[in-house]
Amino acid sequence: MDLKNHFLVAMPSMNDPVFTRSVIYICEHDSDGTMGLRINQPVQISLKGMLDQIKLDNPSPIIFPQTLSQPVLNGGPVSDDRGFVLHYPKDNYSSSIEVTEELSVTTSKDILATLGTEDQPYKYLVALGYSGWDAGQLEQELSENTWLILEADSSVIFDTPIPDRWRRAIEILGISPVNISSEVGHA
């Protein structure tokens, strides 16, 4: 099963403090492993604060300052000093990976210079770090009933308030978090 462009949603019973109530957007899944971005855990810095710290030269005027007030997200515990921008494709950035026809992940600074300007992607989120699994590791966690899987919905990523994304992802499955059991049954 290819999990690219799916959500991993932490089961309510997950006791790993790193991933409790996490929603992870899977960007890559193949025989070598899995890479995704957690989309529902902000860090204590805004996008403007992060951009001020890295001192990018921005030749275009800031015309959408409100977009720079959004929080940066904690994408996961791996390489948490690296930035990842999940966005609707626009232009050609130096280091982008197309996840779907609609979504790309970019890791180069050239996209950061567009944020807040007329050249910014239509919709985007910025995360520091990513969530990663070695070959077979995620499949093992799935067999242990650690995660729920569902096809990704861009409205959860870009239009749902951050604190509501976990609950919303579960609701898309048609279930309530209180009705989920961590026990695996056998018929």
UniProtKB/Swiss-Prot annotation:
InterPro entries on file: AlgH-like
Gene3D superfamilies, alphabetized? VC0467-like, VC0467-like domains
Q: Return the SUPFAM superfamilies for the record.
A: VC0467-like (SSF143456)
A Pfam family reported for this protein in Swiss-Prot or TrEMBL = DUF179
Q: Could you state one GO cellular component term attached to this entry?
A: cytosol
Give the transmembrane region(s).
Answer: none
The UniProt entry, under HAMAP family, shows: UPF0301
What family does this chain come from, according to its entry? Answer: Belongs to the UPF0301 (AlgH) family.
Would you tell me the protein name for this molecule?
UPF0301 protein VSAL_I0547
Biological source species: Aliivibrio salmonicida (strain LFI1238) (Vibrio salmonicida (strain LFI1238))
The record lists the lineage as: Bacteria, Pseudomonadati, Pseudomonadota, Gammaproteobacteria, Vibrionales
